[in-house]
């Protein structure tokens, strides 16, 4: 009986580990550059969003679906939440879990919002959702501001994703 209980506990704890969400702070321009550079060789989508932003919430499942459909073809997806860090456990983590996000995500911890804006794109006015797409060499190839659809995201990445 102990073996059954231990086995069940092990399996249950393992499933919790798979569902656990890793959210890291994003707090400096150097960290943004390093993050983008770390995906060299992959097409990278960086999406800035928040749980309080209706268009962000609406497009989120399309981005997750796009990632699931193309991750084996060198597509990477990075979410950066603009929620308050104090909302991490009550809003951000439950939202990520409900959308099946099982990869590292970031939360804005820049001291000033303007510093994050300048680190991402000096021409960005701070409106969200904001999605930046980089080719495999780290060159920005697309900027999508406002809520978008799966088809709109796919159109931008299609040229740079191998068949």
Residue ranges and their predicted role:
Residues 127-163:
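Thiol-/selenol-based redox modules, centered on thioredoxin-like
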Residues 95-128:
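Short, internal strand/loop/helix patches
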Residues 23-43, 67-70:
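A short beta-strand-turn-helix
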Residues 1-24:
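Bacterial Sec-dependent N-terminal signal peptides
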Residues 50-54, 82-87, 110-113, 148-150:
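Solvent-exposed loop/turn segments at secondary-structure junctions
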Residues 48-65:
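Conserved redox-active cysteine motifs that mediate thiol-disulfide chemistry
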Residues 42-44, 48-52, 127:
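Short pre-active-site segment immediately N-terminal to redox-active cysteine/selenocysteine motifs
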Residues 74-89, 101-111:
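Thiol-based oxidoreductase modules, predominantly thioredoxin-like and allied folds used
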